[in-house]
Amino acid sequence: SASSLPFAPGIQAAIDAVGGAVSVGHCFGALGTAPAGDSLIWYGVHSFEMLQRLMGSGAQSVRAVDLGPAVVTTVAYGDGRYGVIESIRNQWQYGGRAQSSKQSAFFDVDSSRIYHDLLLQIKAFFLGAEPPISMEKTFEGLAMMCAARQSIAGDGAAVPVEKL
């Protein structure tokens, strides 16, 4: 994992704006044709990791369907929370929405800042801070993407998220 998008300031601003725990997260982003490997994983890592930033850990199962223009993935958490990821073909913007029981807040990712914000996290880590993303969270994100691939192959059936 190495997406810079979870560190985009707009995501934290949306989390702060909802005034409580995020119960629903919605993220959208690009789905191009990968030069190698799986396109949903190659491009989807950004949207999946943005969802993790909104929701935290605890994904239990994933359902995904390929609708042609987009792959739509739903992620169920064990406590009633859920997330939606739209991986949109030939669209190169990223953003989403955080929702609590009180309100919703939308965000767009400012692509002019994405590497700057990632480098700030890397610098802090090299200066002794804890890693900004744990190994467990990294694994869960990858497991969510693999579950999405399995779900698409299984006609949208729910696939459990493998745990580390």
Residue ranges and their predicted role:
Residues 1-37, 47:
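A contiguous active-site-proximal alpha/beta segment in oxidoreductase catalytic domains
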Residues 11, 47-48, 115, 119, ...:
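A general structural signal for well-ordered alpha-helical segments in protein cores
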Residues 25-93, 136-143:
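Rossmann-like dinucleotide-binding domain that binds NAD(P)(H)
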Residues 35-41, 106-110, 132:
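A short glycine-threonine-serine/GTX helix/turn-capping micro-motif
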Residues 79-81, 101-105, 157:
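Short acidic/polar mixed-charge low-complexity motifs
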Residues 86, 108, 161-162:
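Short linear motifs in exposed loops
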Residues 92-130:
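Interdomain hinge/lid region at the active-site interface
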Residues 125-164:
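C-terminal helix-rich "cap/oligomerization" subdomain common to oxidoreductases
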